[in-house]
């Protein structure tokens, strides 16, 4: 599990250092670069935590547990797994973008409801108090790809917050679509500085955790 996290953090840090993905708050004519991650691609990286020393990091994510595609019924959503790994590495604060109305437990029923929300351009109400993103130096934004788009609740979050002068590093879980161009949607909704998006297959995040933990344990013994 930590190897995926190291790849995510290393890519984001490299982009921060190089100033990648800066559109100056303007819409870009081309999509930001997208990285796709697998366990085998993850490389060990040293000093990752130090890059975030003294910085306030917010890791806002939307995730759904229950029945999911190709992984069956799960207690922890795929995107939540990645968000928690990022929090462990960066010391960032987690915020779950959770809608007041829960989605059905069954996968087919849930994605049909999500499709209806997308087609009618709904903005589901978010449960709980929202964080003030102006209090943070950087925001990681995580979500699953639903119907080639962000979950509508993520739009609710983005439109209620003020991202002026902020940097957003998007990451997603998917089963073949990659980022699906959602980095552009985030940029349009926030006018924030965007870093390249990172896409991780949901089955990798969900099913490879034990294997990754064992590989990581061997590497430090």
What annotation goes with each model-predicted range?
Residues 93-95, 193-201:
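Short beta-strand elements in bilobed, periplasmic/extracellular small-molecule ligand-binding domains
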Residues 15-19:
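C-terminal motif of bacterial Sec signal peptides marking the signal peptidase cleavage site
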Residues 220-221:
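Conserved small/polar residues in nucleotide/adenosyl-binding loops
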Residues 1-4, 8-9:
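Positively charged n-region of N-terminal signal peptides that target proteins for export
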Residues 21, 31-136, 148:
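N-terminal beta1-alpha1-beta2 submodule of the flavodoxin-like/Rossmannoid cofactor-binding fold
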Residues 75-82, 86, 150-154, 182, ...:
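Stable alpha-helical elements in mature extracytoplasmic
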Residues 106-193:
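Helix-loop-strand module that forms the ligand-binding subsite of alpha/beta enzymes
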Residues 64-67, 99-103, 145-149, 174-179, ...:
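Solvent-exposed loop/turn segments at secondary-structure junctions
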